[in-house]
């Protein structure tokens, strides 16, 4: 019976969380909804409501534990479960290249502070691509940042990268989690740009991602929305992946925009 199953799950989960030093639970479910109905009834709907009920019981018993909900197998990110969990895991595909578009799509519906965005291993388990720690760290910066790997298996340079980007995230976390998020439309479809501006509009953090070979020889102008039109802003490059530029064996298409080569003072007028 469903009531017996529910009580069994409550008992087992309570033992697990009560007898062990658990601070965080990722509630994962990697399967498709192949049988949403059963015997003429909305089984998936009933199961979801019981899942909410189970989280209610566990949340009351263990208020110190953070729950992270899963998105896989049918897109189970929803606003109702957000009243019971602290964040969502956007995708098991943790490839930083793929994550740029995944996280962009999620940003239309949910704010950065509830989006699990983790630095993964340099060789992604899902795509087998390999990315620098800079690219992975900056991709994970604009969310609920974490690490999705075993730090004991990597070299000192990787570990230093983890420390650097964790510190950078903590430095900007107040803005990232409480500012106003902006998605910037770029003329070149191979470029993604986004930013978050503080509530008082005194500072902002923007990320520009070049995801493929550009359609244009030189980068198009970058416009930063959401700023105070009457103010002047100092544009400073905080961090970037290693880039081979013109003069070091590069090509004209690798020429960096002026704001990457030196700080700029610009108007906040859109």
Write out the residue ranges for each language-model feature.
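C-terminal beta-sandwich/jelly-roll accessory domains of carbohydrate-active enzymes
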Residues: 212-270
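Carbohydrate-binding surface patches
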Residues: 186-229
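Conserved, mostly hydrophobic/aromatic
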Residues: 28, 67, 140, 206, ...
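Flexible loop/turn segments at secondary-structure boundaries
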Residues: 31-36, 74-79, 123-127, 148-150, ...
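Active-site groove signature of glycoside hydrolases
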Residues: 8-40
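Catalytic cores of secreted or luminal carbohydrate-active enzymes
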Residues: 131-185
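Glycan-recognition surfaces
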Residues: 1-7, 11, 18, 48-49, ...
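Generic beta-strand/beta-sheet core signal
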Residues: 25-30, 68-72, 209
